[in-house]
Amino acid sequence: MKEYILIAGVNGTGKSSFRGVLEGQGVPLGHIVDPDLIAKQNNFNELAAGKQAVREIQNCLKNGETVTQETTLSSHQVRKSIIKAKEQGYRIVMYYIGLNTKYESIYRIANRVRKGGHDIPPDDVIRRFTHRFEALDRIVPLCDKVIFYDNDNGFVKVAEITDGTFRYTNGYRPDWIVEYHHNKQTEQ
């Protein structure tokens, strides 16, 4: 079955590293769309890389190919692409990578820059971190399955949502997933 796979999380949570884990496990990811990699390979700024990423996703959907997108979920274009994919019979799977604090994300980005990687302004990270649950609220209802991983000290699966039902997958419950789940229960 064709899938639209999202590897999502705030900047610095380890999305690209997690993609490597999935590849190592032999998970079929299809065409991978990574705006950061597009920017680096083509010497594009963030806006141009984002536009190229949208074109690549649209081409995959048009051709019925499985596609994997790395995303912070901060763009409304992600939601539009998911809706289009659902209309075309795609199964939507999201892997969400979380951390407890924005400072951990900022620290990891600074470490990445020291190693020659790309930078993200701290204000952008703070804004995305602050609004991460709102972003999830826009996307989760469109997904067939959501798997939540904590990356405080390596990737640990902490929860999943299948067919709209949330469940913890083990006893490890980092603050961010407890807060997200509590907010969802309070809204119901």
PLM regions and their residue ranges:
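Pre-Walker A (Motif I) flank of P-loop NTPase domains
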Residues: 1-5, 63-65
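Conserved glycine(s) of the Walker
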Residues: 14
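P-loop (Walker A) phosphate-binding loop of NTP-binding proteins
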Residues: 10
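NTP-dependent small-molecule kinase module
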Residues: 140-188
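Conserved substrate/cofactor phosphate-moiety recognition/catalytic segment
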Residues: 17-67
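Short, glycine/charged-enriched secondary-structure capping and boundary segments
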Residues: 21-23, 47-48, 82-85, 108-111, ...
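Structural recognition of the conserved hydrophobic beta-strand(s) that form the central parallel beta-sheet
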Residues: 7, 67-71
